[in-house]
Amino acid sequence: MRNLEKYLSVSEEVKQALAEGKPVVALESTIISHGMPYPKNVETALNVEKIVRENGAVPATIAIIKGKITVGLSKEEIEYLGKEGLAVTKASRRDLPVLCALGANGATTVATTMIGAALAGVKVFATGGIGGVHRGAETTMDISADLEEFAMTPVLVVCAGCKSILDIGLTLEYLETKGVPVIGYKTAELPAFYTTHSGFKVDYKLDDAATVAKAWAAKLEMGMQGGMVVANPIPEEYAMDLDYINSNIEAAVEECNRLGIKGKETTPFLLDKIQKLTAGKSLAANIQLVYNNAKVAAQIACELSRI
């Protein structure tokens, strides 16, 4: 029954790089459609691809285009997703079969980007922040599908920790239960997206891309299921004040609850609200941390290709 070719499209550049054992870095597309306003989203996505190239790897931005999981978007496709914005379906694992069957378009979350990367054979992925356990999840059960994907899908994800709108402690507990290693890149503390500190420890602090690549290669070579989180702090000069950002996050969460916003609309609403409350400072920080993650992911992918 398996007929992957029908649903997967890999760009020639990515296909060739993988065939030659060159480093490739997967990139998500929800950040383009739902994470930032146009045209800043397109500009950021193209800059991220450029940073990956400058650090020796081939970028593979992933989305669902006309019913196919497309690994390696063209500039035109990135522009399209950026312009369409929130009109594009935010696609997680559950959405894939329906969107593919309908020949529809979708922007991939962390979970779906991991699926696309794994199907194509890409082992390293750079994003902003991963999804996790939402605040109040003990009553709402609002837990991102990203976490379950980490338990199943063999892709290393470089991020700036989980988005600080989440319950960081419970997110780490969930990842521990699922056996997912959380690596701090040059840090013993999990970064909290906009800030370098969260008060929570990572499982291991590793200080260079080569060591991270070795640990990831060991997991792959042992045939162990699931991925790896590499938490890379936002550069200090772009980090936001902890109390300032937390008070704005709390205000945004309060409004979200008051308006009854739930499910996959929650994160885009909160990020947009926080951007407005901080007069655009949070968006500027978001862009810088994504750039930093792209650089580190490319370095890890290069080291992995040498093993």
Model-derived features: positions:
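A glycine- and small-aliphatic-rich helix-loop capping segment at beta-alpha/alpha-beta transitions
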Residues: P39-A45, E77-G82, G132-A151, Y174
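Anionic-ligand binding region
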Residues: T196-E221
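General beta-strand structural signal in soluble alpha/beta enzymes
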Residues: V25-L27, P59-I64, G106, V124-G129, ...
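Solvent-exposed alpha-helices and their adjacent loops that cap or buttress functional pockets
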Residues: K15-A19, V24-V25, E54, G116-L119, ...
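Active-site glycine-rich loop that binds ribose-phosphate moieties when present
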Residues: T109, E138-A151, V155-E176, A210-K214
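Glycine-rich nucleotide/cofactor/substrate-binding loop typically near the N-terminus or early
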Residues: S29, H34-M36, V42-L99, E221-E237
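A C-terminal functional module that forms or caps the active site or interfaces directly
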Residues: G226-N292
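N-terminal glycine-/serine-/threonine-rich phosphate-binding loop
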Residues: M1-E54, L119
